[in-house]
Amino acid sequence: MQQRTIQKAVEVVGIGLHKGEPIRLRLEPLSANAGIVFYREDLALNIPLSPDSVIDTRMATVIGSEKGFISTIEHFLSAVYAYGIDNMRVIVDGNEMPIMDGSSISFCLLLDEAGIKELDVPKKVICVKKAVEIKEGDKFVRLLPSDKATFDFRIKFDHPVIGVQSESFEFGTHNFIEEIARARTFGFAKDIQYLQSQNLALGATLQNAIGLDDHKVLNPEGLRFENEFARHKILDAMGDMMVSGHNILAKYESFAGSHNLNYRLTSKLLADSRNYEFVTVKELQSRAFAKSFA
């Protein structure tokens, strides 16, 4: 299996979650070994994708520097992970990605429109060799050696609609589109009101998130999956793992994980070369991982 980029440039316009203003997103092909490079068109600022570029993880994953930043990249990056894209230029004209419908499906459709192009250089993945874990109270995220890429996520909320939920997912592009990509982000009405008083979440609506009051889901159409909340957490985790710039071959496990825990996990993984190795897909003993991108 070779490195991938997209066949042609594509673009879409959507609303930014926090400012509530239109954001133009344009994707362009890049050559082998270029990586995923974000670009703030309004600032003429390149931001290469890597854990070193992460500057905030409180409400979303944010990359940048003192010169400028791009927020809420994780939903987009989960689609990039799912399609096995290694090299691409990601251009936005503001400080956040468009939220679209709060899931990844719009980005999947955009990548379908762009098409996938295989390059002349073998694709490398991060193969986890040793268990790596981050714990915070009873919360944890961990990566374990595995010959498959799997995600197991459990959440617990003191809310009658959510309660305790879990989802186990074996990665594959088709599986992602069917089981994970449409799972939306969610928020509580009382929190949204406070955030908007702070000039945040100004673009949040029931068209781009699951809204909940103290008792029920506010969206007239209801949920897309019974455990949509847990599925969205897997979507987030995939996007946060993609901040490494590569697909990761491992078993991911979490209870009540967050963007911050995911960021600390990838940073800890990559901080010690004994934890992992870069392996071409061709070198992997298991061919199942290569078939995941079919």
Curated annotation (Swiss-Prot):
DNA damage among keywords: no
Catalysed reaction, written as an equation: a UDP-3-O-[(3R)-3-hydroxyacyl]-N-acetyl-alpha-D-glucosamine + H2O = a UDP-3-O-[(3R)-3-hydroxyacyl]-alpha-D-glucosamine + acetate
Keywords tagged on the record: Hydrolase, Lipid A biosynthesis, Lipid biosynthesis, Lipid metabolism, Metal-binding, Zinc
Pfam families in alphabetical order: LpxC
Cross-referenced Gene3D superfamilies: lpxc deacetylase, domain 1, lpxc deacetylase, domain 2
A Gene Ontology biological process term: lipid A biosynthetic process
Binding site for Zn(2+): 75, 232, 236
PANTHER family on file: UDP-3-O-ACYL-N-ACETYLGLUCOSAMINE DEACETYLASE 1, MITOCHONDRIAL-RELATED
Similarity section: Belongs to the LpxC family.
Protein name: UDP-3-O-acyl-N-acetylglucosamine deacetylase
Organism lineage: Bacteria, Pseudomonadati, Campylobacterota, Epsilonproteobacteria, Campylobacterales
